[in-house]
Amino acid sequence: MPRSLKKGPFVDEHLLNKVDAQNEKGTKQVIKTWSRRSTILPDFIGHTFAVHDGRKHVPVFVDDAMVGHKLGEFAPTKTFKGHVKDDKKGRR
C-alpha cells in the first residue's frame, strides 16, 4: 500500500538540509548518505548522491525521471555473479 497523500513523501531531515544548503550556495558537491529510504524530490535534480549499498557508496546522479522514486532503487545491494555451470563430467 502506498504512503498517504496527506502525509507527503518521506525524506530524512538531514538530507533535505544538505540539499537546501547546496542550493543556496549554488554548489553541486557529492552528498554522502546512508538514507536509502528517502524519496527523491524535485529539489534534488542535478545533485549527485553517494548512496550506501552495504559495502560502499554508489554515486547516483538525479535527473527528472527519478522524482518520486527512492534513493535506494538506484544503488543495488546484490551483485549477480552468474549461474554455476553444471559439471557432470567431474562426477564420473
Curated annotation (Swiss-Prot):
One of its GO terms (cellular component) is small ribosomal subunit. Coiled coil: none annotated. It holds the Pfam family Ribosomal_S19. This is Small ribosomal subunit protein uS19. The keyword Chloroplast does not apply. Belongs to the universal ribosomal protein uS19 family. PANTHER family: RIBOSOMAL PROTEIN S19P FAMILY MEMBER, SMALL RIBOSOMAL SUBUNIT PROTEIN US19M. Protein S19 forms a complex with S13 that binds strongly to the 16S ribosomal RNA. The gene is rpsS. Keywords: Ribonucleoprotein, Ribosomal protein, RNA-binding, rRNA-binding. GO terms for molecular function: rRNA binding; structural constituent of ribosome. It comes from Corynebacterium glutamicum (strain ATCC 13032 / DSM 20300 / JCM 1318 / BCRC 11384 / CCUG 27702 / LMG 3730 / NBRC 12168 / NCIMB 10025 / NRRL B-2784 / 534). One of its GO terms (biological process) is ribosomal small subunit assembly.
